[in-house]
């Protein structure tokens, strides 16, 4: 377990020049890019992917902010081995600015922890949600990457964060229930003009992941008019379970494990993506972020 105190992070408030950060052999785009990891169903490995993806992005010196977007009952701090002194509830209650809640995680990433057991934070009201997204947009521009772990399901706060992000990553497993819930999530995102990238977790073979993605894309194309592109498959790997039990992310604890290799490949692909979808804080005004979520 790491130092339980929240460690102040020196973050300059001066405007930053666009810069490049090496990610493997790739050149990363302008600083301030954002990724939201979303799933329709709990238990598919979403938080684990968010944590390990953030650490993979930080491997070569990129400045990374990891946000626990499940404000009422998140677990990012647990998977990072942290016991933070503050969490997002201090900001939402008006006790400190958003940057004042940050803690230092593995590899020096900044972690914005969630509250634990605050049911009143499970769904934020519209003014609070607007303030949060504005402040998060300002904070994210001080980092090369912001990775947001969203709550499972299709609540208004989680969907607003998914639409806010430049790159929504939709995680599922081959389980039929997980696929059904992932499709419902893709449908809600499509209603706001967003097509997520698809990642299939816990596959036995790469061919299984490709087949899951093919069937998902066929259904989405027919009903939604747009198909999520497959951006990666993650194998069922005992290293992931052992690392979670030890509160030690698998890209750190088992860097050569197959699942760690695949997550680093996903990080590399994110760094070389030349066609981001754009977002509210990095591509113009998006008033639709604050509209009610349409019915599934």
Language-model features, listed with the residues they occupy:
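Extreme N-terminal, non-catalytic leader segments
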Residues: 1-44, 55, 62, 96-100
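G-domain G4 guanine-recognition motif of GTPases
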Residues: 40, 173-174, 196-211, 233-240, ...
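Hydrophobic positions on the alpha1 helix immediately C-terminal to the Walker A/P-loop
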Residues: 49
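Inter-motif core of Ras-like GTPase G domains
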Residues: 138-141, 155-176
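Conserved C-terminal guanine-recognition region of P-loop GTPase G domains, centered on the G4
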Residues: 179-193
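Beta-strand-loop-alpha "switch" segments that mediate conformational coupling across diverse proteins
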Residues: 224-251, 263
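NTP-binding/hydrolysis catalytic cores, primarily Walker-type P-loop NTPases
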Residues: 247-296
